[in-house]
Amino acid sequence: MSITIRTLQKRKQDGGKFSVLTAYDACFSRLISEAGVEAILVGDSLGNVIQGQTSTVPVTLEQMVYHTQCVARGNQGSLIIADIPFMGAATLERTLNAATALMQAGANMVKLEGSAWLAEAIEVLNRNGVPVCAHMGLTPQAVNSLGGYRVQGKDDDGAAELLNAAKILDQAGTALFVLECVPRALSAEITREVAAPVIGIGAAPECDGQVLVMHDMLGISPGKPARFVRNFMAETGDMRAAFKAYDDAVKDGSFPADEHCF
């Protein structure tokens, strides 16, 4: 059975959880979807883990289209979310062009990084049959503006701004949210306050779903792992088992634990 946005909306309504992993090719797309993971994110994180870049900024739309096509060919029924890359949402015209290319490549939804200013684009995309996932908190495409990879919403003003932006985008018709590196209490509050399902990464177990970069949860990314990462490969010794263990841990609430949150 294919997973749709309605599946994830009902999961939230019923108080259940769902899992998301990144994939960039047909082989891993198949393995991840066969493990029961509800959604696959074709992330611009491919810049880091596939291309060896130091950020996601160099990733192009053409590259995102190519990897989305690859993932779509291997997918066995998971919902496919594709990132609109750096500067892809600089104007409404660019956003529409990028969304068209990614949806025609096989995505079921596009993901935009930003804040309340995304509302107009989300409304227009919705009218044209394109569901949107809004990525808030730490937005890696803005790493140069943020001054590094830092937890967002730590002080009262930052928290209020994030919560207000989430409500605005929820009203605009956002289908899903991703909260990255947002304090646990704030992540839980946003999850309660918005109708759309919320996916966490370095956020809170109270979020409706969780996402990790595949290479991180397999323990094969270079460098020191982020606080929110758990190495499921080390626990299982097998990739298929690692994907299943991750899915199980998200759904039974054992991941993320306190040590994975801020």
From Swiss-Prot:
Annotated positions binding Mg(2+): 44, 83, 113
InterPro entries per record: Pantoate_hydroxy_MeTrfase, Pyrv/PenolPyrv_kinase-like_dom, Pyrv_kinase-like_dom_sf
Keyword vocabulary terms for this entry: Cytoplasm, Magnesium, Metal-binding, Pantothenate biosynthesis, Transferase
Catalyzed chemical reaction(s): 3-methyl-2-oxobutanoate + (6R)-5,10-methylene-5,6,7,8-tetrahydrofolate + H2O = 2-dehydropantoate + (6S)-5,6,7,8-tetrahydrofolate
GO biological process terms held by the UniProt record: pantothenate biosynthetic process
Recorded GO MF terms: 3-methyl-2-oxobutanoate hydroxymethyltransferase activity; magnesium ion binding
Enzyme Commission designation: 2.1.2.11
Intracellular or extracellular location(s): Cytoplasm
Co-factor binding comment: Binds 1 Mg(2+) ion per subunit.
Entry keyword Methyltransferase: no
Pathway connected to this protein: Cofactor biosynthesis; (R)-pantothenate biosynthesis; (R)-pantoate from 3-methyl-2-oxobutanoate: step 1/2
Signal peptide start and end residues: none
Ligand binding (3-methyl-2-oxobutanoate): 44-45, 83, 111
Pfam families attached to this UniProt entry: Pantoate_transf
Active-site residues per Swiss-Prot or TrEMBL entry: 180
GO CC annotation, single: cytoplasm
Cofactor: Mg(2+)
UniProt subunit comment: Homodecamer; pentamer of dimers.
Entry-linked HAMAP family: PanB (MF_00156)
UniProt record similarity statement: Belongs to the PanB family.
Function: Catalyzes the reversible reaction in which hydroxymethyl group from 5,10-methylenetetrahydrofolate is transferred onto alpha-ketoisovalerate to form ketopantoate.
Name of the molecule in the record: 3-methyl-2-oxobutanoate hydroxymethyltransferase
Organism: Alcanivorax borkumensis (strain ATCC 700651 / DSM 11573 / NCIMB 13689 / SK2)
